[in-house]
UniProtKB/Swiss-Prot annotation:
Residues 195-258 form a coiled coil. Residues 128-155 are annotated as: Disordered. A motif (Required for magnesium transport activity) lies at residues 391-393. InterPro entries: MRS2-like (IPR039204). The chain crosses the membrane at residues 370-390, 415-435. It is found in: Membrane. The gene is MRS2-F. This is Magnesium transporter MRS2-F. Interacts with CYCB2-2. The lineage of its organism: Eukaryota, Viridiplantae, Streptophyta, Embryophyta, Tracheophyta. The keyword DNA-binding does not apply.
Length: 444
């Protein structure tokens, strides 16, 4: 019995090792960039990331580098999924999760993201300090803390963080008003999204500029000299042009789709949704002493959610001006890149038309030369026919042997007259044929 138990224990150990190996294979490295800007590498599995961001598995598959997905920006309840060219990220209200990569372009993108987050955090901290200094001389609108019970202390701390229309949270950046009251600091998720859009648009713009620098000289050289090497270069350039145009078009279509759908843009306000959730939790704690009022509010919330889910809230228009301006700016940029590619495509098409015209002209010249040679062949054949007639073995006076010098001279004269007459007749026939061809428009 003991050996069998040992064998069973060995089988269980092998199963655990296989499970551990499968779990290790399922996990991957993620580069996490929090609101503080200090990036760190974490190893997490798919289920851990799903629990952390609230994303379904199909959204995480968009970030798989082994799978080919078109450019996509998905707004979910707790995260934004970004798949733009080589930029793949999961953006939450407090951090950005990036699939770790050794690509130099990825390292440059991470540096830009950290710099943007740190700069925005510094500006936000300065504005928060200035606003606290301005509000220190104003009487606080909240009651003084008279009790130190845990519930009241937590509730008072959350309420006291709402000053001057700004909600402060230790776990995420906030949307704060600037000193002039006009400019607003974008929330963390929009700053991260802006870096993603900027990186993707800049990458496509650089590829387009490189293609333009190679394409225009190659096309001009092809128009001046048609050769196999130049044709191969233009063929490769056209293939790259088609590929880049498709990628740029996908990014443009995705931005246009977001701009057309206000509800999708409203879903991307992660910080605002989290702030409303915190305020709702605080209000529920305040109203916990009045169960009847809590029940009424709960019924109203349920009815409002049902109306929104059923589409009966027709007049609802979310507050999306900030995100709309952000997306419009990069939509204009990517549309300009697409226009450059369209102009390059038109230039390629014009070059192809010009080359086809040149080739048609060469073909017409060859056909004209063929007609001229064919006509000359017909005329020469007519002359050969005359020679064949005179070469027949028929007794005529022209072939009679001369008996004296006078007949000999006359015979030679007839020979040259016949020869020159045949040549002149063939020449006249050729000239007449060419004149008729030009007059009828067949020849130039």
């Amino acid at each position: 019995m003991r050996p069998s138990a040992a064998a069973g224990g060995g089988g269980g150990g092998g199963g655990r090792r296989k499970a551990a190996a499968a779990a290790a294979a399922a996990s991957r490295e993620w580069l996490v960039v929090p609101a503080s800007g200090q990036a760190r590498v974490e190893e997490a599995g798919k289920h851990a990331v799903m629990a952390r961001t609230g994303l379904p598995a199909r959204d995480l598959r968009v970030l798989d580098p082994l799978l080919s997905y078109p450019s996509t920006i998905l707004g979910r309840e707790r995260a934004i999924v970004v798949n733009l060219e080589r930029v793949k990220a999961v953006i939450t209200a407090a951090e950005v999760l990036l699939p770790n990569s050794k690509d130099p372009a990825f390292a440059s993108f991470v540096c830009d993201l950290q710099a943007r987050v740190l700069a925005s955090s510094s500006d936000q901290a300065a504005e928060f300090t200035d606003m606290e200094g301005e509000s220190s001389a104003v009487t606080s609108p909240f009651p003084a803390l008279t009790s130190t019970t845990p519930n009241e202390l937590e509730m008072t701390n959350k309420n006291s963080n709402v000053v001057g229309g700004m909600t402060h949270s230790n776990s995420m950046p906030t949307l704060t008003a600037a000193k002039d009251g006009n400019t607003k600091v974008l929330p963390f998720e929009f700053r991260a999204l802006e870096v993603c859009l900027e990186s993707a648009c800049r990458s496509l713009e650089e590829e387009t500029s490189t293609l333009e620098q190679e394409a225009y000289p190659a096309l001009d050289e092809l128009t001046s000299k048609i050769s196999t090497l130049n044709l191969e270069r233009v063929r490769q350039i056209k293939s790259r042009l088609v590929a880049i145009s498709g990628r740029v078009q996908k990014v443009r279509d995705e931005l246009e789709h977001l701009l057309d759908d206000e509800m999708d843009m409203a879903e991307m306000y992660l910080t605002e949704k989290l702030t409303r959730q915190e305020i709702s939790e605080t209000s529920s704690r305040v109203e916990v002493d009045d169960p009847s009022q809590l029940e009424v509010d709960r019924d109203e919330d349920y009815r409002s959610e049902a109306d929104v889910s059923n589409g009966t809230f027709i007049g609802y228009k979310p507050h999306i001006e900030e995100l709309e301006m952000l997306l419009e700016a990069y939509f204009v940029q990517i549309d300009g890149t697409l226009n450059k590619l369209s102009h390059l495509r038109e230039y390629v098409d014009d070059t192809e038309d010009y080359i086809n015209i040149m080739l048609d002209d060469k073909q017409n010249q060859l056909l004209q030369m063929g007609v001229m040679l064919s006509t000359a062949t017909v005329v020469i054949t007519a002359g050969v026919a005359v020679v064949g007639l005179f070469g027949m073995n028929i007794g005529i006076s022209l072939y009679a042997d001369p008996t004296n010098e006078e007949e000999k001279r006359a015979s030679n004269m007839k020979f040259w007259e016949t020869t020159l007459g045949t040549i002149a007749g063939c020449t006249v026939m050729y000239i007449v044929a060419m004149g008729w061809g030009k007059r009828s428009g067949l020849l130039q």
